[in-house]
């Protein structure tokens, strides 16, 4: 049994430090030695959830409940995994089942409230944004025939992209039928169902269930401690921090087993800007919480406050460490967002610290040597390193674009040329290399435009003048097959995006069947721009 406890503690430390695989290994070894220990399955469930393996987290949560049906945390683990698996109804039932055994468990109560809110949100989600929308409509006889009507498809796409228009379209019987199919309910009988559900009003029952009389069961010292805490909270709201500290200190003396009073003191010191004291108290609170088996959400809050204190001091690495500890105990959107923010700032700081123009020049020279030898992949690596060392040097992007062109990676070459031009709009090479990439892609119209811009900057640029002439001749002598035109057009990311847009495909179908519809669509500047793009690349022609 001693070995089991050692493995469990080792697993707990690994999980707190973010070493999830080590934690899983420790818990699994402990389970082999003591397969009836419900706490081990609970801890491993938390580790699997942290890793993102929610199915295994759910299985361990179920095992925890099987071994210890009267233990609230087992239900919390199981329900949390179900939440991550988007099985909200089952998660709600699990929280409710847990509350039958531990009616005053704060963690289960909060979980149930969260699930009820999530399920309520689902009623207001956009049903027209389902990934299998058209498949669902095709499979139902009520909507199958409607799909042959282009105006119906256009209406569906409108609601898919702008669900706020639903209120103005709800009177359309086709939309009512569609909603019935998508939501899987008969909307005609909804009013009756709602009326039937109204008689037992939820608010009064919630008030009756609120455990206010529970304070009568508390020992006198804990009652007094709660009163002191309330007085401390009032003082805190008024920013009378010294008075708040006195009340929290008194509450802590009356009930030394409750970590909340210590974290409240930490909050006061945080507001006063004494971050060292704040962290010291949070560590103490966590220690008290662990000793008294406090709800892990409270432990998570203490870790998050330590993270916030480091964030305030711009010590982002330390902040991330404690945010991760908080998330290991309990994941909340606020802490996750703060952690991601700290990671983003730290990454940017590291990027800026990496900048060194002297080392960039060394890498550039190495790249030039490799380029002259024809070793383009190696040259590209040196130019990439040079860009990391000096990301504001336009010439580095131009050099790497030349490598990409040699390696036939024309889209990447174009991207680097755009960056080069943005950094130094008067640098001729940026334009000539961009035009060369477009010319290689046989997009002669665009290539001529770019060569023309280069000539506007320097009318004596022979490279631009020769390139312009080549493109003119190639365009004149061009006899592409429709397949070549389509293949070349579909290599353009902008064309790919237009052609994958269901609304645009519907418009193009309408144009084929009814050419008069074009004039109506061209009134929309966004659609007109997309149609012009398709005309430029030769995919469509208007006679």
Curated annotation (Swiss-Prot):
It holds the Pfam family TPR_12. This is Stress-induced-phosphoprotein 1. The modification N-acetylmethionine is found at residue 1. PANTHER family: STRESS-INDUCED-PHOSPHOPROTEIN 1, TPR REPEAT CONTAINING PROTEIN. The lineage of its organism: Eukaryota, Metazoa, Chordata, Craniata, Vertebrata. The modification N6-acetyllysine is found at residues 8, 301, 312, 325, 344, 446. The keyword Chaperone does not apply. Probably forms a complex composed of chaperones HSP90 and HSP70, co-chaperones STIP1/HOP, CDC37, PPP5C, PTGES3/p23, TSC1 and client protein TSC2. Forms a complex with HSPA8/HSC70, HSPCA/HSP-86 and HSPCB/HSP-84. Interacts with PACRG. Interacts with EEF1AKMT3. Interacts with HSP90/HSP90AA1; the interaction dissociates the PPP5C:HSP90AA1 interaction. Interacts with FLCN, FNIP1 and FNIP2. Interacts with HSPA8/HSC70. Interacts with HSP90AB1; upon SMYD2-dependent HSP90AB1 methylation. InterPro entries: STI1/HOP_DP, STI1_HS-bd, TPR-like_helical_dom_sf, TPR_rpt. The modification Phosphothreonine is found at residues 198, 332. It comes from Cricetulus griseus (Chinese hamster). It is found in: Cytoplasm; Nucleus; Dynein axonemal particle. The modification Phosphotyrosine is found at residue 354.
């Amino acid at each position: 049994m001693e070995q089991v406890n050692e493995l469990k503690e080792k697993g707990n430390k690994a999980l707190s430090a973010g070493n999830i695989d080590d934690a899983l290994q420790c818990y699994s070894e402990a389970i082999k030695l003591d397969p009836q220990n419900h706490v081990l399955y609970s801890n491993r469930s938390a580790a699997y959830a942290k890793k993102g393996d929610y199915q295994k987290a759910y299985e361990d949560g179920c095992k925890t409940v099987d071994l210890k049906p009267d233990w609230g945390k087992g239900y919390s683990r199981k329900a949390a995994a179900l939440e991550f698996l988007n099985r909200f109804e089952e998660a709600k039932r699990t929280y409710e089942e847990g509350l039958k055994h531990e009616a005053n468990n704060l963690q289960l109560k909060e979980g149930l409230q969260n699930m009820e809110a999530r399920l309520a949100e689902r009623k207001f989600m956009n049903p027209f944004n389902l990934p299998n929308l058209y498949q669902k409509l095709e499979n139902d006889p009520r909507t199958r025939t409607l799909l042959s009507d282009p105006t119906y498809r256009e209406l569906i796409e409108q609601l898919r992209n702008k669900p706020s228009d639903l209120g103005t379209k709800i009177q359309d019987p086709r939309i009512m039928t569609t909603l019935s199919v998508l939501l899987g309910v008969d909307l005609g009988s909804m009013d009756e169902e709602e009326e039937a559900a109204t008689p037992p009003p939820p608010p009064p029952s919630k008030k009756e269930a609120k455990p206010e009389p529970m304070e009568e069961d508390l020992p006198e010292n804990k009652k007094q401690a709660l009163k002191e805490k309330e007085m401390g909270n009032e003082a805190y709201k008024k920013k009378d921090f010294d008075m708040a500290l006195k009340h929290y200190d008194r509450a802590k003396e009356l009930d030394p087993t409750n970590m909340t009073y210590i974290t409240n003191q930490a909050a006061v010191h945080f507001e006063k800007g004494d971050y060292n004291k704040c962290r010291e108290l949070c560590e103490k609170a966590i220690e008290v919480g662990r000793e008294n088996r406090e709800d892990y959400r409270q432990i998570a809050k203490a870790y998050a406050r330590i993270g916030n204190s480091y964030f305030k001091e711009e010590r982002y690495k330390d902040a991330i460490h404690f945010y991760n500890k908080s998330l290991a105990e309990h994941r909340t959107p606020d802490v996750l967002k703060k952690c991601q923010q700290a990671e983003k700032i730290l990454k940017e700081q590291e990027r800026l610290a990496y900048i060194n123009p002297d080392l960039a020049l060394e890498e550039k020279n190495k790249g030039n040597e490799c380029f002259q030898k024809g070793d383009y992949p190696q040259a590209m690596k040196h130019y990439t390193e040079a860009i990391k060392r000096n990301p504001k040097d336009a010439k580095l992007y131009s050099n790497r674009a030349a490598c990409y062109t040699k390696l036939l990676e024309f889209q990447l070459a174009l991207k680097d040329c755009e960056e080069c031009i943005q950094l130094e709009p008067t640098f001729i090479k940026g334009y000539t290399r961009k035009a060369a990439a477009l010319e290689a892609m046989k997009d002669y119209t665009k290539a001529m435009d770019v060569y023309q811009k280069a000539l506007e900057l320097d009318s004596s640029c022979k490279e631009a003048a020769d390139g312009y002439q080549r493109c003119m001749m190639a365009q004149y002598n061009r006899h592409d097959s429709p397949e070549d035109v389509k293949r070349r057009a579909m290599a353009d990311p902008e064309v790919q995006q237009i052609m994958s847009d269901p609304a645009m495909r519907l418009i193009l179908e309408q144009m084929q069947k009814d050419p008069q519809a074009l004039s109506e669509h061209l009134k929309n500047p966004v659609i007109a721009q997309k149609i012009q793009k398709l005309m430029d690349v030769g995919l469509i022609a208007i006679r």
